[in-house]
Amino acid sequence: MIRGGREQSMLNRAADYFHDFHCLAGACPHTCCAGWEVVLDEETALRYFQVPGALGEKLRSVIQADAEGDFCFPLRGGRCPFLNEENLCEIHLQLGEAATSVTCRSHPRFIEDYGAFREITLSAACPAANELLLGSREKLTFSSWEDEERSEPADPWLEGLTALRTRMLSILTDRKAPLRRRLTDFLLLAWQAQALLDEEQGEALGDLARTWGPQALECGAGPGLFPWALRVLGELEVLEADWRTLLRRGEETAPARGDEALLERVACYFAFRHLLKAVNDGDLLGRAQLCVLAVLTVERLTPVCGGLGEALRRFCREIEHSEENLEALLEAFCQREELSLVCFFRELCLS
């Protein structure tokens, strides 16, 4: 991007704890090299075909093409074939980090490039990142820095959407109100913003962000989200077999109110990562519903998972790391009555 006759460097944004992250490597209790099949970018795969010696022979014997035609490392016993007995990567040890695939180098980072800026989220499915997120009860803030990469022109209404997200984050962190009231206002603002997007008035999002104020809401009688939302989650693609068991136990266990300060940080984590992705398809409300569903589900699963951190880790691993599951939920918010917006409002108002 060129401003004032000068090329603009890339602006990066991330949570305030981003630079404190350190991989636990072999000490990680839930290694990212198990349970997920590693898909290789083409450049890395071609480089692996040229590696000499015993490691090169193993690489060439292991690499296969998956159903989509992508190169991958099929799991062996649920583990990457290059994960050794100390839970360390043989490729990293022998060739260095730069020789690992893009997927392996970037994990646990979710990286979203919006042209004018880039945003990076440390996945809460990673134990080290999870601990950083939940290791403070302070309001979650976000830092920024520039690098030498050049930015590109942004979508015309990304600026308004970014301002709207800032307003939505400020709602979530307004501790003068109970968390459920904040989540209600968060959804109400998303609902009104969605009406503008549906009318192709994205340029008005900034004005809405500046002028919006809390509104009264009549919930009415009827069902809330639970236990039906847990059953919908159980219909999705599953990574670990006991996930559905945990969801069923969540149905049977009396819900308990969680720590609002920590759940607020969870809400901000999801809002930061997901809301701006509406620039790609216009579905802001669905992503706001995803954020609220995540908070309420994690809170509900905390007793059966043995703690908030583990409940969040499992939700992120099963849902947030599956594009198929995320897309299925966005579709369900539009089509499934048990996940309708009114059910969200009833759950928040009556629970």
Question: What residue ranges belong to the model's regions?
Answer:
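Long, low-complexity, compositionally biased intrinsically disordered regions
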Residues: 2-30, 115, 128-130, 143, ...
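Short, charged/polar micro-motifs that form catalytic or ligand-binding hotspots
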Residues: 23, 94, 154, 158, ...
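Internal, well-ordered alpha/beta segment that forms a basic, Gly-enriched binding/recognition surface
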Residues: 87, 95-185
